[in-house]
Amino acid sequence: MKIINPYTEILTPLDGQAILQHIELCGRVCYKSEDKITDTSAAKFVAGIIKRGHEAVLEHFDITVKFVCDRGVSHEIVRHRMASYCQESTRYCNYSKDVFGSEITVIRPSFLTEGTPGWQYWKVACRMAEKSYFELLDWGCTPQEA
């Protein structure tokens, strides 16, 4: 069993100036002021729409972010459906395979301190879950069922 810290990774290559220019172009449609676009107008324009509370214009740029977090946290994120999500799936991932190192990966809980009794109980529970998962696979269950 591998214990890891939660983390995020931005997968979209980001160019700050290009992002600002794209948002400016979209936002200026609202104000019919496309003719005011210059090489240096984007940052000031975007700051202005934020100051005016016109944040919807910011939605015209998207990024892809990889979240590695507790399943409960990921379910809170996707529940709000403010974006599109892809998530590691127990339906399609068989953790007994070499690609996973023949082990499950669990996220280190932020609410427990390593070495405390709570930490030890949590770790034992995770090991038992891992053992049960592999036994269910051995008995013929699919990864989704296990």
Go through the PLM ranges and name each one.
Residues 1-145:
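Family-specific signature for flavin-dependent thymidylate synthase
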